[in-house]
Amino acid sequence: MNENFEMRDFGTYSPEEIIAENLQELFERADVLGEEEIAHLCELAAEIAQGDDLADLLSSLPYYRISEMKPLAGALADHRELLSRSRKLLEARQCMILCRALYEKLKHRENLLSALFPDVEEVLPQAAGRIVYQRSSYANDAYLAFASLLPNARATYAHSFAAACEEVYNGHCEYCILPVENAVEGELIGFAKLIAQFDLKIIAVCDIAGADASRSTRFALLQRNMLPLSDADAMKNGCFRFSLPKESASLVADVLTAANFYGLEFRSANTLPPSEQSLFNLTFDICGGDLYPFLLYLATVAPQYTPIGIYSHIKQKGI
């Protein structure tokens, strides 16, 4: 018996109190094991982080899977399902700790975000600064708000929202503007479908108020690349949005748990209509949270996820 645990006279205890005391002793032992576990995971993170090529390092992150459980005898066999679930929770926790420790080793590396999102599309000189959108009074106000963020912003007009997306997709314009939400309908699924169809990334959003303040519309500024306009602004007043394919539905609960572990606040979730590619779109508030470890976690356990945007929420000019 561990000499650090004092002997107790259980003769005066009720059965419930004895069980509670035994559980408390197990918790204390678990704390010691937990410290050892974290130390080992930090050592593993240090080993992983030794690679020189950051992109190769991130692409080879280990995906920890539960090993096959050995046959259980006696009473334990009756709890196989419960033990299996408990082990999966332990596996998830270890992965979250590992990614947090790995970020501590990598955070001083240059271009960490670029390594996490390596598929950067080159912007042609004639497209740089061009913002395309379908004209309306609301969209004009959104353009003025977004143009204040961009040097040499120039407006270009499209005959439809799909045409605006296509201009960016084909490299003719650097940015486009789409309405993505309003106070009446909530999220506008038709525009979420356009964003997915053309693989565009949200880099800023702005709420445009109408004559009736209750009828505001949220517009998004989008581009082909995932990198935000400003890391600092996005971290202070930003969101992270991504999608998981239908076949990854079982991962949603794990992802929500990890987001909470890293201090990200859940904002919304939706799915595209069944007739389209089935996707779970998830949005988190990243202010005050640890986004980078969460990105490492997603790269490890859900490499099939699709980033939709790391973006800041800007105010309409004059409001």
Model-based region annotation:
Residues N2-I319:
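Domain-level signature for soluble enzymes in the chorismate/prephenate branch of the shikimate pathway
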